[in-house]
A protein has these predicted regions:
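RNA-binding accessory domains that recognize and position tRNA/RNA substrates
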Residues: 2-197
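Conserved small/polar residues in nucleotide/adenosyl-binding loops
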Residues: 200-202
Length: 202
């Protein structure tokens, strides 16, 4: 078995070893889990996961790659992704990049090879807590010190809201609606457009 390259360390001191993909950097965030069987690209680009480390309980992630049309926002702001098995050879005629390539492009560190079912049970039983992604060789005490000293971001809206006013118009126009964009997903925009609502995003 090849040596581990990354590990995640929880506030409680628990450690999980695995292998890195995506951005090769240290990162901290609140750890949460998602039980979806498909839709990892939508999760990756969901603004409600900004700066959070998302544990995917479904065991295989990355097998259909990333497509340009399926983002929920212009760019992902997720803190990181933790998966059981990562597939770097997607099979999908629509895909344009691998999950790892996109995460590297946007500075998102990811770890695979983790027992995500056990990790999910810990989150369920102990509640959410902060976590740090570091090199596997880092001592636990040093990782916990860095986690404790890492700043906690408060203003998530600033990162995910629009910078200037923009419009999303629909052909079957019935009403104009002002959307206060605090991190609106593209699917919400599409559904409102389908109902005949043209949106002014502010």
């Amino acid at each position: 078995m090849k040596p581990f390259t990354k590990k995640i360390v929880l506030e409680s001191g628990r450690e999980f070893y695995g292998y890195g993909f995506g951005a090769n950097r240290e990162a901290t965030g609140e750890i949460v889990f998602n039980t979806s069987m498909v839709g990892y690209q939508e999760i990756l680009s969901d603004p409600s996961y900004t700066d959070q480390m998302v544990v995917m309980t479904y065991p295989l992630i990355g097998n259909y790659g990333i497509t340009d049309e399926d983002y929920e926002t212009k760019y992902p702001t997720i803190g990181g992704m933790i998966v059981r098995e990562y597939n770097d050879l997607p099979s999908n005629f629509r895909y344009t990049k691998t999950l790892g390539e996109v995460c590297e492009e946007y500075g998102i560190p990811c770890v695979w090879g983790i027992d995500t079912r056990m990790l999910t049970r810990i989150i369920r039983d102990e509640g959410t807590q902060r976590v740090i992604v570091v090199d596997a060789s880092m001592p636990q005490e040093e990782a916990l010190r860095r986690l404790k000293e890492a700043p906690v971001r408060r203003d998530m809206v600033e990162r995910v809201s629009c910078r200037k006013r923009w419009f999303s118009r629909t052909a079957n126009h019935r009403f104009d609606v002002v959307a206060v964009d605090c991190g609106i997903k593209h699917n919400i925009i599409r559904k409102l457009n389908e109902k005949g609502l043209s949106l002014i995003h502010i």
